[in-house]
Amino acid sequence: AKYPSGGGDVLMGSIITRNDALARTIKLSHMRLGTGVGANDVETLLRSLPTLEMRYTSQDKSAREIASWCESQPVFAQVLHPALPKSPGHIHWQKLCVGEQYPKGRAAGIFSVVVDAQFSTTQVDAFCDALRIFKIGYSWAGPMSLVVPYQKQNIRTLPAPHLKLGTVVRFCIGFEDVADLQADIQQAIHATLV
């Protein structure tokens, strides 16, 4: 419920199954763990729903523009955004997310860049720290733009060729001006990766 809540600060969801045995297991787990959604979280979500379309569309548009711009930056070996034709999974994304209602598809405000392998993780961390508008953070869908570096090999097993590309940095685009965010990335590149 990150996007529906409007602030990226509500964690909630649902599990739906046609399997009765699995439904009973899930219900028992829910009862035993005592998990549930608080009234304040529900209120936040209900209050934010009317602006969901506007927020999602804005963040999607900004993320596409910045991701496209990042493709022209030589320090990035790859840009991972499903709407970009060069991005892995683009064809699959088109099948799922492009249709009559949304001819250009929907892709949210999240994308990643793979910083060229010539740069160390220390340099990539310095790049993220040098950003002035982007804040370090793991969330998404909120009004502020966030960035977080991560090393894929420490998170999951991936094919060796993919690991050779470099360190991944995830950007979550908020509501700041696109030109300001691009300028922020550019100044951080010049300060740390050149």
Report each predicted region and the residues it spans:
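Active-site C-terminal subdomain of aminotransferase-like
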Residues: 1-110, 114-152
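PLP-dependent enzyme catalytic core of the Aspartate aminotransferase-like
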Residues: 118-122, 130, 145-194
